[in-house]
Amino acid sequence: VRDPDTGEPARSPALYKEVTERIRDSKTDVIINLTAGMGGDVVFGPIEAPLPLLPTTDMVGASERMQHVIECRPEICTLDCGTMNFADDVMANTPSILRSMAKIANDCDVRIEIEAFDTGHLWFAKQLVKEGIIRDPVLIQLCMGIPWGAPDDLNTFMAMVNNIPNDWVFSAFSIGKNQ
């Protein structure tokens, strides 16, 4: 969702609740899928003085990152399955935070949609399934063309597809010209 005053992305549970209630009140038969990716943004200072982190850093714990999911109870929520450089910033998702977020989703009976931005994210997703943290059927979204994750060329796409277990349900998207 976006902050109506600034137009910037927001993780306010009240804004998510307003949107999900509007959708449900419309009686439209759709599956609601909310992001759980916000709250993991690390923005470093200048190259020669990266600390302290810049005020635009938005890094909070697993419970706060999942608060809108707890309150809104969508059918699905995303789980960004790893840390990566994201343009000039860092999207930080440690294994322990991801395990905690997945447990919260499971406790709320919300289906997890894994978001894999690179091949290492697939590797960790398989580990979460092996540990029983992510339930069948496993849903995974391949997120292509995000700077500096997996490029959106056919070879990289096929490498990722070929690493998805046959019993998982996958989809994919790209940003930019290959969208």
Tell me the role of every PLM-derived stretch.
Residues 1, 38, 118:
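Residue-level "edge-of-site" marker
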Residues 7-15, 53-57, 61, 89-97, ...:
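Alpha-helix N-cap and loop-to-helix initiation/capping positions
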Residues 1-5, 35, 125:
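Histidine-centered divalent-metal-coordination microenvironment in nucleic-acid enzymes
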Residues 10-13, 41-59, 113-122, 171-178:
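Active-site glycine- and acidic-residue-rich loops that bind
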Residues 75-179:
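Catalytic alpha/beta core domains of metabolic enzymes, predominantly
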